[in-house]
Curated annotation (Swiss-Prot):
Catalyzes the NADPH-dependent rearrangement and reduction of 1-deoxy-D-xylulose-5-phosphate (DXP) to 2-C-methyl-D-erythritol 4-phosphate (MEP). It comes from Mycobacterium avium (strain 104). NADPH binds at T22, G23, S24, I25, G48, N51, N128, E130, G207. Belongs to the DXR family. Keywords: Isoprene biosynthesis, Manganese, Metal-binding, NADP, Oxidoreductase. It comes from the Bacteria. This is 1-deoxy-D-xylulose 5-phosphate reductoisomerase. The keyword Transcription regulation does not apply. It is an enzyme of class 1 (oxidoreductase). 1-deoxy-D-xylulose 5-phosphate binds at K129, S153, E154, S178, H201, S214, N219, K220, E223. One of its GO terms (molecular function) is NADPH binding.
Length: 407
């Protein structure tokens, strides 16, 4: 590991392993690393294989030889890929010396690489929230204090604000949500949403699944769970508010009545750079707020009746055990069905609710703490099967000319 100098700054370059290098977070992380060659160096890349040309370009630009591709067919086409197959990213982590592992893989398949990174002793810059949500107790048990640093802008903001007080001084944590592209819509209007509409986020540029999760507010539900797991604050002291401008990324309210907020224009390079260099800031990582021009910041309550995903996540988190893994797996199945045009937008959250209800009624074992990864995977398999049944019975997708934004 890199040691700090006498003034607290890091000595030497941090070796960074980038998992999910061809996605939105991964490509921006490589931009941050390339802009700061005195601070960081890339020692390995991992990707699924869908964007093979991008991965090969990244390999050429960084000069790394340690590359992992999950898609074996894509790996054969590329040639000279040392790690391939479903466990490629995990093996890459296990066999590559790194100071920082950035896990920007998509979905719960990031769980084993997350555990491998923690086992290696590297700092885990975690963008793959699903691995923490699916394997929460296992991940927390494997992590040393301070070993996990969040990449999500909201949790990065909380980590920064929490520097302003001690743990027993925290009254509540406040997560902000843009409200997504359908803020102010009714439940009836949401029934006619198309995948194209759900893929247009008003303030952030993200991958397709994260963008859809933001539109359904499932992403904020996942972030609620992640907040509890990362910072240990009870669910009843974590609040979600809508902030359409996405300038204030989260806030911490302390027992004396003061509130600290972290504000910056929407740019993921800021939380990425902070996670890579933690606890040190990287100069010039992103633009700052311009207070010389007139602007207004709005905050409003979340409509939990129209967007119940956050309260469903709260229920899953309070139930404990593998229930958060079930929440995530049910969403992945329902979201895939929506993107394929098989179900309506509203059916995504309805499917999650149905699967959680089934788990409450018929599978109480899932509320128990998992003993190992296999327990988590069993819960996810059960949830996916339940979700597939629910999807098969769900309302098909329809488009109405009355829907806002539909022509």
């Amino acid at each position: 590991m890199t040691n700090p100098t006498s003034d607290g700054q890091p000595r030497g370059r941090l070796r960074v392993l980038v998992l999910g290098s061809t996605g939105s977070i991964g490509t921006q992380a490589l931009q941050v690393i390339a802009a700061n060659p005195d601070r960081f160096e890339v020692v390995g890349l991992a990707a699924g294989g869908a964007n093979l040309d991008t991965l090969l370009r990244q390999r050429a630009e960084t000069g790394v030889t340690n590359v992992a591709v999950a898609d074996e067919h894509a790996a054969r086409r590329a040639g000279d890929i040392p790690f391939c197959g479903p466990e490629a990213a995990t093996r890459l982590v296990e066999e590559t010396e790194a100071d920082v592992v950035l896990n920007a893989l998509v979905g719960a398949l990031g769980l084993r690489p997350t555990l491998a990174a923690l086992e290696s002793g590297a700092r885990l810059a975690l963008a793959n929230k699903e691995s923490l949500i699916a394997g929460g107790p296992l991940v927390l048990a494997a992590a040393a204090p301070g070993q996990i640093v969040p990449v999500d802008s909201e949790h990065s903001a909380l980590a920064q604000c929490l520097r302003g007080g001690t743990g027993d001084e925290v009254a509540k944590l406040v997560l902000t949500a843009s409200g997504g592209p359908f803020r102010g819509w009714t439940a009836e209007e949401l029934e006619h949403v198309t995948p194209e509409q759900a893929g247009a986020h008003p303030t952030w540029s993200m991958g397709p699944m994260n963008t859809l999760n933001s539109a359904s507010l499932v992403n904020k539900g996942l972030e609620l769970i992640e907040t509890h797991l990362l910072f240990g604050i009870p669910y009843d002291r974590i609040e979600v508010v809508v902030h359409p401008q996405s300038i204030v990324h989260s806030m911490v309210t302390f027992v004396d009545g003061s509130t600290l907020a972290q504000a910056s224009p929407p740019d993921m390079r800021l939380p990425i750079s902070l996670a890579l260099g933690w606890p040190h800031r990287v100069p010039g990582a992103a633009a700052c707020c311009d207070f010389s021009t007139a602007s207004s910041w709005e905050f409003e309550p979340l409509d939990n009746e129209v967007f119940p995903a956050v309260e469903l996540a709260r229920h899953a988190g309070q139930a404990g055990g593998c229930m958060t893994a079930i929440y995530n797996a049910a969403n992945e199945e329902a979201a895939a069905a929506f993107l394929a045009g098989r179900v309506s937008f509203g059916a995504i959250v309805e499917t999650i609710a149905d699967v959680l209800h089934a788990a409450d009624q018929w599978a109480p074992k899932f509320s128990e703490t998992p003993a190992n990864v296999d327990d988590v995977l069993d819960a996810q398999r059960w949830a996916r099967q339940q979700a597939q049944r629910a999807v098969a019975q769900a309302r098909p997708a329809t488009v109405s000319a009355k829907t806002p934004g539909v022509v």
